[in-house]
């Protein structure tokens, strides 16, 4: 089984000005300054290239190694019944700062994932960082 995992930039949630224009009949009221942003979401996603299925996960703090592995755990819990025959998992990663080959925390968390699930996990990195397109 092969999956591709990636995270995106933090999204600030709220009625903040984006410098755009209203396309509706009535303009949407927004705050005129984006200071003291309180609400944010960190999006992450997993794609199964063979089936075309995708799985989105969100956090509220930062893009970290643990955030990425937690997303993989969530995906596995969601798909475990359907993928019960899978013994090997190949994970494509973009070699970004939260998951690159030098991050011992990421490797430690991935080892925990492999031990918990019983899967043989292989990490495949795109090089250089952020060139996963």
Regions found by a protein language model. Give the residues of each.
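Two-metal-ion acidic nuclease core segments, chiefly of the RNase H-like superfamily
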Residues: 106-124
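A short acidic (Asp/Glu
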Residues: 13-16, 99-108, 133
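Hydrophobic beta-strand segments of well-ordered beta-sheets in folded domains
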Residues: 1, 87-91, 122
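Active-site- or DNA-interface-adjacent structural scaffold in DNA-acting proteins
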Residues: 1-18
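Hydrophobic/aromatic beta-strand patches that form the interior of the parallel beta-sheet core
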Residues: 3-5, 55, 124
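A contiguous, basic/glycine-rich beta-loop/short-helix subdomain that forms a polymer-engagement track
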Residues: 24-26
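RNase H-like two-metal-ion nuclease catalytic core shared by retroviral integrases
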Residues: 124-133
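Electropositive, glycine- and tryptophan-enriched low-complexity nucleic-acid-binding patches
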Residues: 29-92, 97
């Amino acid at each position: 089984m092969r999956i591709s995992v990636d995270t995106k930039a933090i999204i600030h949630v709220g009625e903040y000005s984006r410098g755009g224009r209203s396309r509706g009949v009535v303009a949407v009221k927004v705050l005129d300054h984006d200071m003291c942003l309180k609400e944010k979401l960190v999006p992450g996603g997993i794609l199964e290239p063979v089936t075309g299925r995708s799985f989105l996960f969100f956090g509220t703090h930062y893009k970290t190694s643990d955030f990425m592995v937690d997303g993989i755990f969530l995906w596995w819990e969601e798909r475990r019944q359907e993928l019960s025959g899978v013994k090997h998992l190949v994970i494509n990663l973009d070699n970004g700062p939260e998951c690159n080959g030098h991050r011992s925390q990421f490797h430690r968390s991935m080892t925990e994932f492999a031990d918990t699930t019983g899967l043989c996990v292989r990490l495949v990195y795109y090089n250089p960082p952020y060139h996963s397109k």
